[in-house]
């Protein structure tokens, strides 16, 4: 019966895609990458036509977003927005209506300050004085009540003092919060706002926007795509239902190689970025269209758990990223083996590092007929600038033991202001750390702490917590579990490029736990990782004599390599997802 159930599960795995949520990252098309400010009513309508006729709507792409370039200044008497008479001679509402008639959603653009980016960098003078600043409610009413738009991208060129000619010094939190309130005042609760500030704004953004840009503008080059991926590797803790790290509009189908296009789209999918196509849909290449319509990849992006894949390992220069699908802490997961290097790499993937035990059935999300089975480890060769993405179903789910610092949450984290002056923690590249990153500049306030909010324990109980830290002088870490302070540790690893460890015993409750590292008064050490391992008393549960008997073939017993065995062997075994000692 066990084999039959596994076979049935594999059939389901290979013939269905992940459950699609209603609040997943925005999917659609945006005008900026191809057209810049040189847009028109006919161009926008043509993209809506193509989205439907080419089958993109059928796989989930449902937004047509008008970016910068439609402005015509403001009325001198009452300040209402004027629309470019040549590019949009009939105004915006007929265009939005046309998009809606196609069964699609319509998006628009503005700036949090006075002037748009196009007015500054593209010579589009009609974009001066047209931003939200001074007109928050007036413009929100026009966009969302009068025209019926469903999405808005709000730039910050007019709000940043080093960009705008007025030298306005506007506060990002104040401006985006005010605009969000103006949208709320329209009575619309379904509008998605994207905050385009070109860096992670701060954790306050959750209360203002549906998504937010995390980097500078993308361009159609591998270095740009690679850099954006690198900056988002450590942002998984800031992604949740209705709140997404925006890796910028897609450059797929423009000038990247076929392999780079696959990596670009695949990583945007598994990392839960919004998916906004940037090429001209009217002339899209068949190869590009086939990639963008790959349902198995889209399902990863729109999965109902709303997770961004997190870094689980760095092997031979390649990153392993993983996330749950359909069920938290279940046996179905998606993982990527990402090769940012300029040469092909062969990687030995230890499935236990992905918390997958026993026989693992998987398929390549790019080539669904490429089905694999593996126990313990499997080998994959990844092209230069490439990625292999798999959807996997395991016989058993192992408890996660390694939590990298770059998967933790810092409540003060932001990338806009000088973090040292603000005393806010950040994530930094560090080649001496286990996955190439660390969390640093932590402490000096209770809020500036590092915490993992998703430490799962199947049964609860006693665990060994090991902290990998970096500190060239004596500093303290206060360890808290589920809001209760456990212990304060004095740490000194003997150098700022040397990882030291401290181990203590903690108690976890059954289910989800939060582990927090803090120092309310002074700087604390930089953090590489934590290990969380069950201990009873040595990190392993003892097997009682009655457990030596396997009563039926459904008992889940494995050796440490993940191979299923009929009876526990001498030493450490895995029984029903827990390490036990015979």
Show which residues each predicted segment covers.
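Glycan-recognition surfaces
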Residues: 135, 185-186, 190-280
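Extracytoplasmic
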Residues: 345, 354-365, 379-537
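Residue-level detector of functionally pivotal "anchor" positions at catalytic/ligand-binding pockets or at interdomain
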Residues: 399-403, 533-561
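Aromatic-lined carbohydrate-binding/catalytic grooves of carbohydrate-active enzymes
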Residues: 43, 47, 51-165
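Aromatic-lined carbohydrate-recognition surfaces of secreted/lumenal glycan-active proteins
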Residues: 104-122, 183-202
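C-terminal tail/sorting-segment detector
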Residues: 572-582
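Carbohydrate-binding surface patches
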Residues: 268-271, 276-278, 314-356, 385, ...
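N-terminal signal peptide c-region/cleavage motif recognized by signal peptidases
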Residues: 14-16
């Amino acid at each position: 019966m066990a084999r039959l159930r596994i076979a049935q599960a594999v059939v389901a795995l290979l013939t269905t895609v992940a459950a699609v949520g209603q609040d997943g990252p925005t999917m659609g098309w945006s005008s900026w990458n191809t057209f810049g400010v040189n847009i028109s009513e006919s161009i926008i309508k043509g993209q809506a036509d193509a989205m439907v006729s080419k089958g993109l709507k059928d796989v989930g792409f449902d937004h047509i977003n008008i970016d910068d370039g439609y402005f015509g200044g403001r009325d001198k008497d009452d300040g209402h927005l004027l629309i470019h008479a040549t590019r949009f001679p009939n105004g915006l509402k007929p265009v939005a209506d046309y998009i809606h008639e196609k069964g699609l959603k319509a998006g628009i653009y503005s700036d949090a300050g006075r002037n748009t980016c196009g007015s500054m960098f593209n010579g589009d003078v009609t974009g001066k004085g047209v931003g939200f600043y001074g007109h928050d409610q007036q413009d929100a009413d026009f966009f969302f009540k009068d025209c019926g738009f469903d999405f808005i991208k709000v730039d910050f060129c007019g709000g940043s003092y080093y960009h705008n000619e007025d030298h306005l010094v506007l506060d990002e939190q104040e401006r985006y919060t005010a605009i969000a309130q103006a949208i709320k005042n329209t009575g619309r609760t379904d509008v998605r706002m994207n905050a385009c500030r070109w860096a992670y704004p701060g954790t306050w953004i959750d209360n203002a926007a549906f998504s937010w840009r995390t980097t500078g503008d993308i361009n159609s080059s591998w270095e740009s795509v690679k850099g954006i991926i690198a900056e988002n590797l450590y942002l998984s803790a800031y992604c949740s239902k209705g709140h997404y790290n925006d890796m910028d509009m897609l450059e797929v189908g423009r000038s990247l190689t076929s392999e780079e296009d696959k990596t670009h789209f695949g990583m945007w999918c598994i990392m839960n970025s919004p998916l906004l196509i940037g090429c001209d849909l009217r002339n899209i290449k068949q190869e590009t269209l086939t990639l963008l319509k790959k349902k198995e990849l889209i399902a990863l992006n729109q999965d109902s758990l709303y997770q961004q894949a997190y870094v689980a390992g760095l092997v031979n220069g390649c990153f392993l990223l993983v996330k749950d699908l359909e069920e938290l802490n279940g046996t179905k997961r998606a993982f990527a083996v990402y090769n940012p290097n300029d040469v092909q790499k062969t990687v030995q993937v230890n499935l236990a590092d992905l918390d997958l035990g026993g026989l693992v059935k998987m398929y390549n999300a790019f080539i669904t007929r490429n089905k694999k089975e593996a126990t313990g480890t499997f080998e994959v060769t990844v092209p230069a600038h490439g990625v292999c993405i798999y959807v996997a179903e395991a016989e058993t789910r192992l408890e996660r033991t390694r939590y990298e610092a770059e998967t933790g949450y810092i409540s003060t984290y932001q990338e806009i202001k000088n973090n040292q002056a603000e005393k806010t923690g950040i994530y930094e590249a560090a080649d001496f750390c286990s996955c190439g990153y660390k969390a640093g500049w932590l402490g000096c306030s209770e809020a500036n702490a590092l915490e993992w909010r998703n430490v799962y324990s199947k049964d609860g109980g006693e665990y060994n917590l090991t902290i990998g830290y970096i500190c060239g002088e004596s500093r303290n870490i206060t360890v808290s579990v589920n809001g209760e302070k456990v212990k304060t540790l004095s740490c000194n690893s003997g150098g700022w490029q040397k990882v030291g460890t401290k181990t203590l015993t903690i108690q976890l409750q059954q289910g989800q736990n939060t582990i927090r590292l803090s120092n309310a008064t002074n700087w604390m050490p930089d953090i590489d990782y934590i290990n969380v391992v069950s201990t009873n008393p040595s990190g392993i549960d003892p097997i009682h004599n009655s457990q030596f008997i396997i009563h039926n073939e459904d008992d889940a017993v494995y050796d440490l390599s993940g191979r299923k065995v009929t009876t526990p062997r001498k030493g450490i075994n895995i029984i029903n997802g827990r390490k036990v000692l015979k």
